[in-house]
């Protein structure tokens, strides 16, 4: 089990399957099964416009886990994974606990179905470590920082690995997600690290033409 506490129920909107959701589209592009026809259609449309996007979820996942391994090897044993998405074959706490069995992780995501699937399917923690899930949005950093789940799971006086990986490009600039990240970084103790990946149009060309 993660902490031995019963999971809090999370209700999904009644029409959740009528509109594509970024977490489900990302899951589809990454070869997952936690998606619906509307998400697959959206994903196919994106790949048709930007063929290189097809491999992006796998690449960013590889990057994030490599970064977690490096941080854990360097002594970081606490991780705040924001925009965690649906559980993958190997998750942040599993990667970290292979190096340090005491590692702790808080997963954060705004998508209701991610919360349900994470609590139901995520692999158990080592007895010495722990993981928890917090339903929250990167754009509301104070809710994350002030959450009892975060404070009960992580020691905010010790270095933390902050992982807003592959999430900023999903938010409009008008919401100023970069300011939310700055707010989170300022709140972290000395010795903390941030692992960040971001889509760029540099490699997302329309096909393989010369434009």
Predicted stretch roles:
Residues 1-136, 140-156, 185-186, 197:
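Rossmann-like AdoMet
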Residues 117, 138, 195-211:
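Class I (Rossmann-like) S-adenosyl-L-methionine-dependent methyltransferase catalytic domain
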Residues 134, 160-164, 180-201:
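Conserved beta-strand signature within the Rossmann-like core of class I S-adenosyl-L-methionine
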Residues 137-144, 169-178:
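Active-site glycine- and acidic-residue-rich loops that bind
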Residues 154-169:
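Short SAM/SAH-binding signature in class I
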